[in-house]
Amino acid sequence: MYGRNTIFRKATIEGYNIVIVQEGDCISEEIKISILQCGTMTVLPYEADIRRNNPLEKRIVLPVNAFLVEHPVHGNILIDTGWASNVNDILPKYLKHFYRPQITPGQTAKEQLAAKGLRPEDIDVVLLTHLDIDHTCALKDFAGKAKRIVCAELEYFYSPRYVYKIRQVWDTWIPYIKTEDRIHYRSSTLGPVGRGFDLFGDDSVLCIYTPGHTDGNFIVMINKSPSDRFKHHGDGDVGSSFAVIAGDAAFSETNLNEHIVPGYGFNRKLQLKSVEFLADLRKSSYCCGMFFSHSSSDRTEIFF
């Protein structure tokens, strides 16, 4: 479909914003990804710990991260939202005990974006990788202000699974997701189960279905230039430079290095497939970085 030297350019014609795809060098403007640590939680990081005697002794403090992607064509993309400033008022008692959330003034996604000179109205898309409360808690700060709120897990949420009813706080997202932004997965050659969706339809931001942690969880691949990865991944290491927001498909590098399943998953076998897929992606010579929702990083920003 596109060659490796294809680039995206934004243009306005007769009042309509469009993306022009043309041959040339890679995007001259850099793509920037910022990690926004929006507080912490205290949980069991590995699935094996949950099944041991006295598992609470293994609980550790982990960051709760959201991510800002500043894209030269598609603008500002916020991936997940982290804790809200009033998280302890939002969570029911049993979830407060489960997560033990902590957040200090200035740590919310909204406040960190303000420090960068961005308002909620400046966010073009809010992407929710799944519907757990540590990812949706601060969605209210962007609802009605960000141009789009996109989530794919809704088709799984409306299922008989009781875990959805006790683990996810409906009021943090149900009022804010419009019907037209309920994205459905489609077939692709990329991912542990071969499903995903192309967010903008131009191969720049791919949401790859990685079930296991929840039934509808996805990771986000940001491509430097069109790669046609959804169609030709089976041909080998194809395309251009990319970065990955792994969300909760893996909590940290340890999951990838040792093929350890993260804690609190819906399906351990699918979790392991998703972890192995991420490990393979990270080996690619085109991979510029991989970031996790619950892992600290020496880098808070990446340009590529």
Each predicted region: which residue ranges?
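Metallo-beta-lactamase
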Residues: 20-21, 101-118, 122, 152-208, ...
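Basic, amphipathic N-terminal segments that precede the first structured/catalytic domain
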Residues: 2-63, 196-199
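Core dinuclear metal-dependent hydrolase active-site scaffold
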Residues: 35, 66-71, 77, 184-233, ...
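Active-site metal-binding loops of divalent metal-dependent hydrolases
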Residues: 38-39, 81-83, 131, 155, ...
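Feature marks short, surface-exposed loop/turn motifs that line or immediately flank catalytic pockets
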Residues: 42, 85-87, 157, 251-253, ...
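Active-site metal-binding motif and surrounding structural segment of the metallo-beta-lactamase
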Residues: 93-150
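Conserved beta-strand hairpin/beta-sheet module of binuclear metal-dependent hydrolase folds
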Residues: 31, 40-111, 220-247
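Cap/insert and terminal regions of metallo-dependent hydrolase folds
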Residues: 98-111, 221-304
